Regions:
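Proteolytic maturation boundary segments
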Residues: 4-148, 283, 291-364, 372, ...
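Peptidyl-prolyl cis-trans isomerase
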Residues: 25-29, 33, 222-229, 276
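A short acidic-Thr-Gly-centered motif at the start of a beta-strand
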Residues: 288
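Long, His/Glu/Asp-enriched segments that create or flank divalent metal/ion-associated functional microenvironments
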Residues: 379, 387-388
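PLD/PLD-like phosphodiesterase catalytic module centered on the HKD motif
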Residues: 382
Length: 526
């Protein structure tokens, strides 16, 4: 499986096997490879295809022999791989942990307050058999609220560029991959509506490199050269200059109408792209990634605790910088349409006539573990009902389902979504079916058989998710984030909650969706 790359071992053991195989390969064994494999043979078999119009396209058997003979005639010279050099040394004045607070949730984690004001949430994980042994998220409480209000759309474009290119010491992100010092370190930066984050994970033995990378990205950032930015701008402007896709244009209008022309959701236009320059790239980076007074670092690792503490003091507690920017009080985007709203558009077909239907229910629901579990029941049962009616009985689509979108932020509404494609002539009938099925669920609730089937599926899926989380520090760290920031409860007695879900709970959630706002999007090509 080493040669074919179909591992029969867990990743760590596979890596050990590969290293042992590679360590046994020397230049002396490689030097004789061509002769051993291709020349010391009584017969050479070749299968090739020569097109009629180009009969010499593939070499003949004699030509192949001549090529191999020329290789044997010349002594092979060793050409070892060479790597670029990276100055990875940093001079820092370490800080310290000034306060520790223990929390019993998630099996136990700690909150550390550092001497520079940064908060760290650290969780010591059980050993995992995976490549990632350190997962970190460096989260700044900035996001879109930190951008200049008069250049917001341009700033969002600049942020997208920053997130792709951000590196350090004259190297963009892509170039950093060439350095052996950073092998085994994964880097991701992102700027979202509510926060900006640097996400770093590392293999065993690369934990200090990960922390050092975080320090360099935040203290010695490199955003690339102007030529790279201008090429990206030119490529995007070229795409804007092409004939707009009718479906994309409709989606932009739909978003604008549903969310009340929220400034964070404006599409990139030529004016916004043209307004981006190197100065704005730098300003957007500083607004997103230098507010150290509001930096929170989440760490989950199965490595030595003392080492993690030392790296935190050296590379996190030493972060310094002023933050002169003000943040806006812009509210998060929420659907502003009330009641039942129908948004439609019809255009000429690109191929076959089709209607794309997205039926969205919007309702305020309290985000608790129990409510999320109730939504799992509703998703499973409604999906089965929609599939049975719209696909099996009506023959109206290949796939249809219902899914509840639960936001991390509990101040945002829940959304229940049914989306599918159908033939234009069936649109009105099937849109009516979507509402009728929800009305029936809100009136009578699910049957005992439906509850039993849903419960079995949900219990099985939960077990699969727990097994995956137990082997993934990235997933465990994500749970730490959601526990601390949004109050999610992953310690609840899942089986007890599952047994406590009744048909009336599912019916009541359906009633909330039915009583909420309905936004129906229909895009037709015929």
């Amino acid at each position: 499986h080493f040669l074919r790359n179909h591992p029969l071992l867990d990743p760590v053991e596979l890596q050990d096997v590969q290293n042992k195989v590679l360590s046994g390969i020397s230049w002396e064994s490689v030097r004789d490879y061509p002769a051993d494999m291709f020349l010391d043979s009584e017969a050479i078999y070749s299968t090739c295809y020569n097109p009629v119009e180009n009969p010499g396209f593939a070499p003949s058997a004699d030509a192949v022999r001549a090529i191999l003979a020329s290789v044997e005639a010349e002594p092979l010279e060793a050409q070892y791989l060479s790597y670029p050099k990276l100055d990875f040394d940093v001079a820092v004045t370490p800080g310290r942990i000034v306060k520790r607070t223990a929390n019993k949730r998630l099996g136990g984690y700690e909150e550390w307050l550092l001497s520079n004001g940064v908060k760290v949430y650290y969780r010591q994980a059980a050993p995992v058999k995976a490549n990632v042994h350190l997962a970190t998220i460096w989260r700044f409480d900035t996001g879109y609220r930190s951008y200049p209000a008069d250049k917001l759309t341009a700033a969002r474009f600049a942020a997208a560029y920053d997130n792709r290119t951000l590196g350090f010491r004259g190297c963009e992100r892509q170039a950093l991959r060439a350095f052996p010092e950073l092998s085994g370190v994964n880097i991701l930066t992102r700027t979202q509506q509510q926060a900006a984050s640097v996400e770093l994970s590392a293999a065993r033995g690369k934990e200090e490199a990960a922390f050092k990378t975080g320090w360099l990205l935040l203290q010695e950032p490199y955003l690339g050269e102007e030529a790279g930015l201008e090429k990206t701008k030119a490529d995007n402007l070229k795409n804007l200059g092409r004939k707009p896709n009718p479906r994309t244009a409709f989606e932009d209008k739909y978003t604008k109408q549903v969310y009340g022309d929220h400034p964070w959701l404006h599409p990139f236009d030529s004016a916004a792209i043209e307004a981006v320059d190197m100065a704005l790239l730098r300003e957007v980076y500083e607004r997103a990634f230098t507010d150290f007074a509001h930096l929170t670092v989440f760490i989950t690792s199965d490595l030595d605790r003392a080492d993690i503490e030392a790296y935190v003091c050296q590379y996190v507690a030493s972060l310094q910088g002023e933050y002169p920017y003000q943040k806006t009080a812009t509210a998060l985007p929420k659907p502003v349409l009330k009641g039942r709203q129908l948004i439609t558009e019809t255009n000429a077909p690109e191929s076959e006539p089709v209607s794309n239907i997205d039926y969205m229910y919007v309702a305020d629901v309290k985000t608790t573990t129990r409510c999320i579990l109730v939504s799992d029941f509703l998703d499973y049962i409604l999906s089965a009902r929609y599939l049975n009616l719209i696909r099996e009985e009506r023959g109206g689509t290949y796939h249809v389902g219902f899914s509840t979108e639960v936001p991390d932020n509990p101040t945002l509404p829940w959304r229940g979504v049914v989306d599918f494609q159908t033939r234009p002539e069936m649109t009105q009938l099937l849109v009516g079916d979507v509402r009728d099925v929800m009305e029936a669920m809100a009136k009578d609730g699910p049957t005992a058989e439906e509850m039993d089937q849903a419960g079995k599926y949900i219990r099985k899926r939960h077990g699969e998710l727990e097994r995956r989380a137990a082997s993934s520090l990235l997933e465990q760290n994500d749970r730490l984030v959601r526990t601390v920031l949004w109050g999610r409860d992953f310690d609840a007695d899942y089986d007890a909650l599952l047994r406590g879900i009744k048909a009336r709970d599912v019916r009541d959630l359906a009633r909330k969706f039915l009583a909420g706002d309905h936004i129906v999007e229909i895009y037709t090509e015929e």
